[in-house]
Amino acid sequence: MDQLSSDKPAATIPAQAQRVLVLQGGGALGSYQAGAYQALCHHDFEPKWVAGISIGAINAAIIAGNPREKRVGKLKEFWDMASSGSVMPWAPLVRSDRVRSVFNETSAALIATFGVPGFFTPRFPPAPVWPAGSPESQSYYDTSPLRATLDRLVDFDRINNDGVRLSVGAVNIKTGNFEYFDNYKFRKLGKKIGPEHIMASGALPPGFPPVEIEGEFYWDGGIVSNTPLDYVLEHERDRDLLIFQVDLFSARGEVPATVLEAAEREKDIRYSSRTRMNTDMNKKIHDAKKAVRALIAKLPPSFKDDPLVATLNAVSKESTVTVVHLIYRSKVHEASSKDYDFSRIGMVEHWAAGERDVYASMAHPEWLNRPQSDESMVTYDLCESGLQYIKQ
């Protein structure tokens, strides 16, 4: 998993902007984010804020809950453990996409049957056998192993007292409202982030049970929105932002030719959470605020002290935002089960892909100097031809 980082020169990342890491949900694909983070560390990218949903919340908690020198090791420990239940020594010898596809589906079926070490185990008797309303009747799997794993790999005292900001999203089951558990906000309220907040962000029904926090019950945030970019942009307007957004599902893809391909494509669209649309909308909001500021600057002096002008000044305040957008691109042999195929070979491949994509981004220095002209928000997408500047 670290074979790509030995002989690559590190690029220089601008220091003036607050560095943010945004991690989408995506189950077994999450090792792509771990590989991306390892490569970012090699390039001295030290996030001051990590926001995640579902598996992104778990990765985010491991990053925020450890000192810098231990983060990659803890991420490796988690992903080695999660993939230890599906290790087949002969798997790397498979070269045929068709055979590899069969292997992936078999691995996913085994995971669905036996669970993932340190993450979840199947309930026995199964959920339908238990009385309605009992905790065991609400999900097919028991996630108590994940709590023990988080307690072991994450220093929650560090999260609740250290400088790295952590934000994880979940949905309130009763209200249907999206909520973020944010250690910065919690500190002001005298509250603390714990394993339950991370588990709530990843409690995808009906596989995983809801998580109770202060009398309210929560499910996976990906049900409402699988990418926490909007939250970051909404809650930081005073400082420039340099955001690495690491997504696990691509909104773009080919028209399916089979039922299996249709199932995968549907999942990609659903969990990509309209990322490009959200980015475009935020860009339009930034540009509108910029236009308001320009208009205010042209007002006669007699209008400067008008309360309405003061209000417009306040609401139009914006920082400069650069988003570097990395998206995991599915392989031909992957299907709709890719997010619960915790096989060792899949984990290693996803990790390596995350590393490669970060190095590819760093090979295009145009974004490093933030060449934004007079624009307040720009996005760079990594595509097959390199890092592409997206004009919204």
Positions of predicted regions on the chain:
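Small-residue-rich anion-binding loops in enzyme active sites
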Residues: M1-R19, A170-G176
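Patatin-like phospholipase
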Residues: P14-V22, G27-Q138, S144, L150, ...
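Short active-site oxyanion
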Residues: E46-W49, E216, V321
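Hydrophobic/aromatic beta-strand patches that form the interior of the parallel beta-sheet core
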Residues: A51, G169, L242-V246, T322-L326
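Amphipathic alpha-helical surface "interface" segments used
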Residues: S96-F103, G169-T175, Q372-Q388
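Active-site gating loop/helix substructures
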Residues: P125-D238, Q245, R252, V259-E261
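C-terminal helical/tail subdomains of lipid-metabolizing enzymes
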Residues: W130-A132, S137, Y141, P145, ...
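Acidic, Ser/Thr-rich peripheral helices and adjacent loops at domain boundaries
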Residues: A257-L299
